[in-house]
Amino acid sequence: MSAATDEILEKLKSLSLLEAAELVKQIEETFGVSAAAPVGGMMMAAPGAVPGAAAEPEEEKTEFDVILEEVPADKKIAILKVVRTITGLGLKEAKDLVESTPKPIKEGTNKDDAEETKKKLEEAGAKVTVK
């Protein structure tokens, strides 16, 4: 390895759990990726069609996407507040997300978190699906 990568690795080893979680969140936001996506099944499913078909349903049982389908105009502000709370997005980003439905609010989350997110959004008046 190069000196630069060795140095980065040593700095990563010294991070606390909280700092590591913040780093993951910043990387996800900066590069538009999800740390949950490269679990292995998705990338490995592409080369082999038959084994991939068997692996995908297993992942779908443990990882869920919460999709904001519809936002009634009279409920937009309440839904916007809930979206900001759930995602941690800024006002402009959350507004853009709410106005461009259907859009995923959370991806690759567990069942309990997906159901809780759906409940909060539906209480605010949004139409939501969990896939």
Curated annotation (Swiss-Prot):
Residues 99-125 have a biased composition (Basic and acidic residues). It holds the Pfam family Ribosomal_L12. Disulfide bonds: none annotated. One of its GO terms (molecular function) is structural constituent of ribosome. InterPro entries: Ribosomal_bL12, Ribosomal_bL12_C, Ribosomal_bL12_C/ClpS-like, Ribosomal_bL12_oligo, Ribosomal_bL12_oligo_N_sf. SUPFAM superfamilies: ClpS-like (SSF54736), Ribosomal protein L7/12, oligomerisation (N-terminal) domain (SSF48300). Keywords: Ribonucleoprotein, Ribosomal protein. GO terms for biological process: translation. Coiled coil: none annotated. Residues 99-131 are annotated as: Disordered. One of its GO terms (cellular component) is cytosolic large ribosomal subunit. Homodimer. Part of the ribosomal stalk of the 50S ribosomal subunit. Forms a multimeric L10(L12)X complex, where L10 forms an elongated spine to which 2 to 4 L12 dimers bind in a sequential fashion. Binds GTP-bound translation factors. Belongs to the bacterial ribosomal protein bL12 family. HAMAP family: Ribosomal_bL12 (MF_00368). Forms part of the ribosomal stalk which helps the ribosome interact with GTP-bound translation factors. Is thus essential for accurate translation. This is Large ribosomal subunit protein bL12. It comes from Gloeothece citriformis (strain PCC 7424) (Cyanothece sp. (strain PCC 7424)). The lineage of its organism: Bacteria, Bacillati, Cyanobacteriota, Cyanophyceae, Oscillatoriophycideae. The gene is rplL.
